[in-house]
Design a protein with these regions (language model features):
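Flavin (FAD/FMN)-binding glycine-rich loop and adjacent Rossmann-like elements that form
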Residues: 1-200
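Extended hydrophobic-aromatic, low-complexity segments
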Residues: 137-140, 273-274, 346
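Blade-edge beta-strand/turn elements of extracellular beta-propeller
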Residues: 310-313
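Short, conserved beta-strand segments of beta-strand-rich sandwich/propeller modules, principally
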Residues: 333-335
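Short beta-strand-plus-loop segments that form exposed binding edges in beta-rich domains
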Residues: 337-344
Length: 355
């Protein structure tokens, strides 16, 4: 609400006190200063910390701009993405009487954020993540959203681990960007226009079949490299209901391999709007509990020449992404038998990986 004429960092307490004065003053007027019908209302909660939309931004090897966002730039070294509007707030907050609080420039689609915006151009061992990354002021108007900050932080954490692996500084990781991107995807991250090409994933070289499927939900979708709905492309395998004995998805490997892990990505219905709010009215509109689309119970069966050589049971799952540790066993076939979902009438699986 405030901060244009003050130092957002050094004058933090002063800004906070001014905001308290505005908030309680407006509430006093609503409750006591006119015919607003609020005489019997009580103020339930006021935040204690001013929310900083921006303060310091550090310069990296690339400065993300408004043009990059509006033109949906797809960088070769993308490690994060965003899609929020370019959201410009009135500089003087409540004191800008003639302006709307927010001037939001909407656009369709998403943009990517390059790795080069996450490390300092002149401090050789410094990464940034969150609202201090290398963007212009208008670039930050979109990238400042918490979800965007979060996935950038995950990318930086993974990048730091690779710097340790290769004994390099952040700028020196450029030759290993593909490895970083694949690390992000393996942990169920998403990067536009980047598919799973993990050389270690044996599923990519397998043939896939299922006990049933529907049009658009073919078994081969689980190894197409994309683990969520993108535009009109649905991308999962979807069973035609659930038979009494369950539904099976079978991956026939390109030979006999020792398999110790199978990763599965299910449908948690990303299209369902979840609003984190203190509003009781909004909370009452939210779906309570586990997403019904998620698979609940299933078995991962290792087979060699058609004979079972290992089985791992998973019960009560409530997560979208499962990394299932198996007893390392030589096999040439992986059967995953899905027994129950958390309520949905069919099974949906976006991705299967085999390691």
């Amino acid at each position: 609400l405030m901060g244009d004429g003050e130092d957002i960092i050094l004058d933090y307490e002063t800004i906070r006190d001014d905001l308290y004065a505005y908030a309680y003053g407006i509430w006093d007027h609503i409750k006591n200063g006119g015919d607003h019908g609020a005489e019997n209302y009580a103020l339930q909660w006021v935040g204690a910390l001013p929310g900083m939309r921006e303060s310091r931004r550090l310069m990296g090897d690339y400065v993300l701009t408004e043009s990059d966002i509006l033109e949906h730039r797809m960088f070769d070294d993308a490690v994060a993405y965003g899609g929020w509007c370019v959201d410009l707030h009135a500089a003087h907050g409540l004191l800008d009487f003639d302006l709307l609080p927010s001037d939001c420039h909407h656009f369709l689609g998403v943009y990517t954020i390059p790795y080069r915006s996450y490390y300092s151009k002149n401090i050789k061992n410094l990464y940034m993540a969150g609202r201090d990354i290398s963007t212009s002021k208008l670039g930050l108007a979109s990238t400042r959203i918490i979800g965007c900050c979060a996935i950038g932080g995950e990318a930086v954490g993974k990048a730091a681990s690779l710097c340790r692996k290769y004994g390099c500084e952040p700028r020196g990781l450029a030759p290993h960007i593909r490895e970083l991107q694949q690390m992000i995807l393996r942990d169920d991250g998403y990067l536009p226009n980047v598919k799973n090409t993990d050389d270690a994933d044996m599923a990519l070289r397998a043939s896939v079949s299922a006990t049933s499927s529907i049009a658009g939900g073919e078994p081969a979708n689980v190894i197409n490299g994309v683990s969520r709905k993108i535009g009109e492309d649905q991308n999962p395998w979807r069973s035609d209901g659930i038979a009494d004995g369950g539904e099976a998805l079978t991956l026939t490997l390109d030979g006999t391999h020792v398999v110790s892990e199978v990763d599965l990505t299910f449908d948690s219905n990303f299209a369902y709007p979840i609003r984190v709010t203190m509003s009781a009215n909004r909370q009452a509109q939210q779906r309570i509990g586990v997403a019904p689309e998620l698979v609940r119970d299933y078995d991962v069966i290792q087979k060699l020449d058609g004979k079972e050589v290992g089985r791992t049971e998973v019960r009560g799952n409530y997560q979208r992404h499962n990394a299932v540790a198996l007893n390392p066993t030589g096999c040439n076939e992986i059967e995953i038998r899905f027994i129950a979902t958390n309520g949905a009438p069919s099974v949906k699986v976006y991705e299967v990986r085999v390691y």
